[in-house]
Amino acid sequence: MINVEREIGGRVLKFQTGKVARQSAGSVIVTYGETVILVAVNSAKEPRTDINYFPLQVEYREKHYAGGKIPGGFFKREARPSEGEVLTSRLTDRPIRPLFPKGFKNETQVIINVLQSDGENMPDVWAGVGASLALMISNIPWNGPIATVRVGQIDGDFILNPTRSQIDNCDLELIVSGNDETIVMVEGEANEQSEKTVVESLKFAHEHIRNIIDLEKELFDAVQVEKLPEPEADLNSELEAAVGGKLGSKINDIISIKEKQDQSDAKEELKKGILEDLKEDFPEQENEINSIIEDCFKTSIREMILTKGSRTDGRKTNEIRDITIDPNFLSRVHGSTLFT
């Protein structure tokens, strides 16, 4: 059993491994104040060959017993995930998913359970920290670490990981994920703030993200795990060249179509034509061809935004879509409004 701890935001943050879920590829107990979460990660030994995406499942659950409650009424067991649990699962998924090596298609699970809640220290941000650390100390190839913090602002002062009662009084609340070098995800809400205040809040968050990552590395160094080799990039230069030759300048023509449905139809028509043209030379490689086409579209769209400052529907980067608001859309339903 290995423990490391450090004071973060006026409370003790503790990481522990080797005591619970020892059969998992990686597991860690994260304690902050008196809030305790368990994160366990596992991965299949063999990759999926029938898919062209990474099958990652992140599941976050807040057990009733964590708050000292027993489910009452007719249903005595835990119900399906709540909206908050689903959103926290996504909040954890977003910063960790891009850090898996390209081509890694082994089914991977990240299971996060809140074991104890003190009612004040929010467990959601520690789900991402625990997932990062559990992946680090597992044999699963992953290019972390990352850390997540919550930043609040009360009376002009920034607060790291504000308590549940403090959040109600915050003018700004951000959840920020990042690595040693940069910020990779931001989510939050605020009253109207200046750009300077938002930038300062992100700098404040990143400073403490680095501090948490240092503690993650301390535990990682103590565990000394041997990682599985990263999968070799399955690059078929001949196939890429063939697809690229079929695409030509057609991509730019399609992404310049302003009507969304027309653009989608043109894209699907192009895909069908390329698959038909290449099916003899590259049989049973439909997934690979589709993946190459999607990558080419993504690259072209990003290039158009960065070089021309224009999106696919013609809007500039500082413009928003037109919106039509129809109040009292339903005559007998209170507060019904249609936004289109």
Where are these regions (language model features)?
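Alpha/propeptide regions of enzymes that mature by internal proteolysis
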Residues: 1-2, 8-11, 25, 53, ...
